[in-house]
Curated annotation (Swiss-Prot):
The gene is psaI. This is Photosystem I reaction center subunit VIII. The keyword Plastid applies. GO terms for biological process: photosynthesis. It comes from Trieres chinensis (Marine centric diatom). It is found in: Plastid, Chloroplast thylakoid membrane. Belongs to the PsaI family.
């Protein structure tokens, strides 16, 4: 099967990179909101 390598790419991407990216984006959003409020 040609797509046999897909799980080895998608699992770290969804399991590690996506949560780290969303946490960083959320942290930046909170920080920017905190700066504008004060």
């Amino acid at each position: 099967m040609a797509a046999a390598f897909l799980p080895s790419i998608l699992v770290p991407l969804v399991g590690l990179i996506f949560p780290a990216f969303s946490m960083a984006l959320f942290f930046i959003y909170i920080s920017a909101d905190d700066i504008t409020e004060s």
